[in-house]
Amino acid sequence: MAASARPVGVGGERATSFAMACSLLSRYVRQNGAAAAELGLGIRGEGEAPRAAPGTMSLLPGEAERKKETMELFPQSAGFGQQDAITADSAADAREQEPEKRQLTIFYGGKVLVFNDFPADKAKGLMQLASKGSTVAPQNAVAPAPAAVTDNTKAPMAVPAPVSSLPTAQADAQKPARANASDMPIARKASLHRFLEKRKDRLNAKTPYQASPSDATPVKKEPESQPWLGLGPNAVVKPIERGQ
């Protein structure tokens, strides 16, 4: 009995010694929590807060943005908004590329020519071409021959050369010029003769006396013929005297 009780006592002593060792270890860990953490036992001290797990630093920040996928709840391709915006932008670009057009009016040969929606650059080229030409056109100018229209299916037609009428026009213009040059002295002499005659008449009318008595023209006196009540030309009219 005594032998059997001894081992029981020995086991109880072992259990108590192990419990004491555990209690001492836990007390030590609580008191020295930093040292236990360094050992990596997973035991923290009494006043120590739980530590967050260390995170990894990404050396390529663009990878996270690539992985993000956005979900479009209102896609524009399903409606008409994006298409209308594209058409409006294309129309604005076309307007910017298209040259400005205005109305062009040309006065030529006594006629008025009006062209609508004429490009501005072509109008400038036309003005430069007109300024290069002669400023004074001849009176009998030859009309330009129409340009020949070439057609691949038909044989080319020969355009007749225009007959110039400038030599005949110059000859006709020289004839009256020569005639006027020959008539100039005669016309001047006639006008000078008329002027001298008028001047002579004015001088004769303004002279206060005659140059000689022979030059004086006799003045013919006509008998007085004053009829008085039908008595004839020789009737004598006596004045009537009023009595006082």
UniProtKB/Swiss-Prot annotation:
Ubl conjugation in keyword set: yes
Stretches assigned to the Tify domain: 97-132
Post-translational modification: Ubiquitinated. Targeted for degradation by the SCF(COI1) E3 ubiquitin ligase-proteasome pathway during jasmonate signaling.
BP GO terms, sorted: regulation of defense response; regulation of jasmonic acid mediated signaling pathway; response to wounding
Assigned GO CC terms: nucleus
Keywords annotated in UniProt: Jasmonic acid signaling pathway, Nucleus, Transcription, Transcription regulation, Ubl conjugation
Annotated domain remarks: The jas domain (185-210) is required for interaction with COI1.
Name of the molecule in the record: Protein TIFY 10b
Bias (Basic and acidic residues): 194-204
Biological source species: Oryza sativa subsp. indica (Rice)
Stated family: Belongs to the TIFY/JAZ family.
Lineage: Eukaryota, Viridiplantae, Streptophyta, Embryophyta, Tracheophyta
Gene from which the chain derives: TIFY10B
Region (Disordered): 193-244
Keyword Transcription regulation attached: yes
Motif stretch (Nuclear localization signal): 187-194
SMART domains: TIFY
Function: Repressor of jasmonate responses.
Superkingdom of this protein's organism: Eukaryota
Motif (Jas): 185-210
Entry's localization field: Nucleus
